[in-house]
Amino acid sequence: MGLTSEYPNLNIVLNDYCLWMEDSQFLNNLSYFYHLTIKLKKLLEKDFTCQKLEELYAKAKEESRYLSLTETLLITTEYIEERLPQYKTRFLKCLSDGTINIVADPEDIYEKNKNNEAGRDRKKHLYANVVLRHNTKDPVTLVHEFLHTINNEPDNRISRKYITEAISIYFESDMCEFLKRKGFTEKELMINDIFRHADLSGCVDDLMPIFPLLDSFRLLGPINSDSYDRMQQLSIEPLAMSKEEFYSKISNFEERLARVRKRNELLHITDGPKPQEPLVTFGYVIGTLIAYYGIENGTDDIHQRMIHLNNIVNKATFSDLLSYIDIDITNEKGLLKKIVPPLNKKIQKIKAYSSGEKNEPKEK
């Protein structure tokens, strides 16, 4: 059976990905990461449904502070001067030479199809699109995408792919802390917390079928209508979903991949953040958890290490990069002990906001 007989887009992507990741420590330990994902899913779905998070996001959007383009640029420049001074010249250059493309008010189909993203175009030129919302999310997004222009270099397999999100999300979170010090209230900044939490939940949900799919593809070949039954027969993974749910997600992936291909053709993107990479969402999951850990342990040492990750992201393995910030990805118990408390703190903060409790810091 060829790659294009059933679910053609998905099978081509799985094939390319397995070739790219051949013999890697990560690909050979899919089961470990799958079980970590299951535990995260149970933790995340305990308090909020997707619909509830959407409602909270809409509320937080209304309560966020309006920011003009000028205000966003001034705030972001001030943040970089204070927290990332070595990158100020580069930031200003990216703004002046168009590397950072700020879409203030999308007007045509070309602009309306743009997302907040960074990558390289067909000529291999760096770019970062930042679509303004004219609220307190804008400086956070601008910092996030700017960091991607710094670490968007030729791949070192998994190292850069899945660590760069940790770097960008850490500094977007650090920007939120900076905004608090500048007088922004917790309520005005909740839009960022809720967006990131909803994104984390969605990414974890997306990952659930991906790990079994990759194992199935490696061992059984292209995904088809028999894959689920064969996976169960061979006990490839203890599938945490019904057959109907499994194939529903596969169909959604196939449709999404087709849309992404069309969109990338429209925008002439060849090296952007490709959702067709099966585990692209893993970068957002591990990145968010590392960022929360870094902010919660907000010492200057951690901050400097996160900055230095940009310099070594193409020179070390995935596990070595995490070890640099005192995270052992191979020790499940130790890993959960470090990443779960900061995540729980975020969950409690959103729960307090949801119930109407005041989120302002209390006097000690």
Model region roles, listed by residue range:
Residues 9-30, 35-50, 229-364:
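C-terminal, non-catalytic "cap/extension" segments appended to globular domains
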Residues 133, 137, 159-162, 199, ...:
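Short, solvent-exposed segments of well-ordered alpha helices
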Residues 2-127, 346-354:
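Contiguous, non-catalytic segments that form substrate-binding/exosite surfaces or channel walls
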Residues 155-202, 287:
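Post-HExxH zinc-binding segment in Zn-dependent metallohydrolases
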Residues 141, 145, 149, 153, ...:
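Catalytic glutamate of the conserved HExxH
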Residues 124-142:
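Short pre-active-site segment immediately N-terminal to the catalytic Zn-binding motif
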Residues 195-216:
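Active-site-proximal binding-pocket segments
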Residues 83, 153-159, 178-188, 218-226, ...:
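Inter-helical turn/loop segments and adjacent helix faces that build the functional surface
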